Amino acid sequence: MVRISVLNDALKSMFNAEKRGKRQVMIRPSSKVIIKFLIVMQKHGYIGEFEYVDDHRSGKIVVELNGRLNKCGVISPRFDVGVKEIEGWTARLLPSRQFGYIVLTTSAGIMDHEEARRKNVGGKVLGFFY
């Protein structure tokens, strides 16, 4: 299998395990972007605890699933989004206004679209989950 995007592979394996009713999933290889994305998901309660396992290669992440994740995905290419354009992206990607999050990478770090709007920063779209 050819790895196009490590983040895409991680989110797809989580989504597939969630659909199958699994309680946990192992993601490998890991990266800092995946860990930050998982922190945003955990902050909003879409996943449980996760643990980084160092295997002296690229590392693994074991994620506890709690059954709240309906869909997650990566937006490729990573489009530039200004603060005023965030509303349009949420309307395009999410099922409703109060449901789900878009994850952005900004100059202030990786965060969801609501936090980016509060801090008044734009960035690049990484992905979404709901």
Curated annotation (Swiss-Prot):
InterPro entries, alphabetically?
Ribosomal_uS8 (IPR000630), Ribosomal_uS8_CS (IPR047863), Ribosomal_uS8_sf (IPR035987)
The organism sits in which domain of life?
Eukaryota
Disulfide connectivity for this sequence is none
> Which GO terms of the molecular function aspect are on file?
structural constituent of ribosome
UniProt keywords, alphabetically: Cytoplasm, Ribonucleoprotein, Ribosomal protein
Q: Which GO terms describe its biological process?
A: translation
Q: Which GO terms describe its cellular component?
A: cytoplasm; ribonucleoprotein complex; ribosome
- List locations, semicolon-separated: Cytoplasm
Q: Which family does the similarity line name?
A: Belongs to the universal ribosomal protein uS8 family.
Entries under PANTHER family matching the protein: 40S RIBOSOMAL PROTEIN S15A
> What HAMAP family does its record include?
Ribosomal_uS8_A
What is the name listed in the Swiss-Prot or TrEMBL entry for this protein?
Answer: Small ribosomal subunit protein uS8
Taxonomic classification:
Eukaryota, Viridiplantae, Streptophyta, Embryophyta, Tracheophyta
